[in-house]
Amino acid sequence: MPPKSRAGAVKKVRRKEKKNVAHGQAHIKSTFNNTIVSITDPTGAVISWASAGHVGFKGSRKSTPFAAQMAAENAARKAAEHGMKKVDVFVKGPGSGRETAIRSLQAAGLEVGTIQDVTPQPHNGCRPPKRRRV
C-alpha cells in the first residue's frame, strides 16, 4: 500500500470577487406567498438577492409587508458592499410587499431612479384557478 498523504491537504477556494458596480437594477417579485428581491448590474447579472424565506420567515409570515422590507434591506446591504449606489426598480406581481420593498431600498441608502411595473398581463391566456370558498 502506498503511504498516505498528509491529513487535511490545503484546498484552494475561489473567493467571490467584489464587483464595483455603481448603477444597477432591482427586480422585486412579490407574489401572494413570498417576496423575492434581486439586484443586478445593467446587463442582468445578479449581484445580490434575498427573499422573505431566506431572511428567516416561514409559512404565512413570508407574505407580509414586513418580511418584504427585511428582504429588500438584506439585498440592498449586500449590493452596497459591491459599490451599488443607484438602482432602477422593476416590480412584478400582485403581492403585499411591493411598496414596502421599494421604501426599504431607499432607506438602506440606495438611490431609486425609475420604478416600472412589469407584471405580466395575459391576453386571455391560461385559465385562472377556481374561486376560493372560505
From Swiss-Prot:
InterPro entries: Ribosomal_uS11 (IPR001971), Ribosomal_uS11_bac-type (IPR019981), Ribosomal_uS11_CS (IPR018102), Ribosomal_uS11_sf (IPR036967). NCBIfam families: PRK05309.1, uS11_bact. GO terms for biological process: translation. Residues 9-18 have a biased composition (Basic residues). Part of the 30S ribosomal subunit. Interacts with proteins S7 and S18. Binds to IF-3. This is Small ribosomal subunit protein uS11. The keyword Phosphoprotein does not apply. Located on the platform of the 30S subunit, it bridges several disparate RNA helices of the 16S rRNA. Forms part of the Shine-Dalgarno cleft in the 70S ribosome. It comes from the Bacteria. One of its GO terms (cellular component) is ribonucleoprotein complex. Keywords: Ribonucleoprotein, Ribosomal protein, RNA-binding, rRNA-binding.
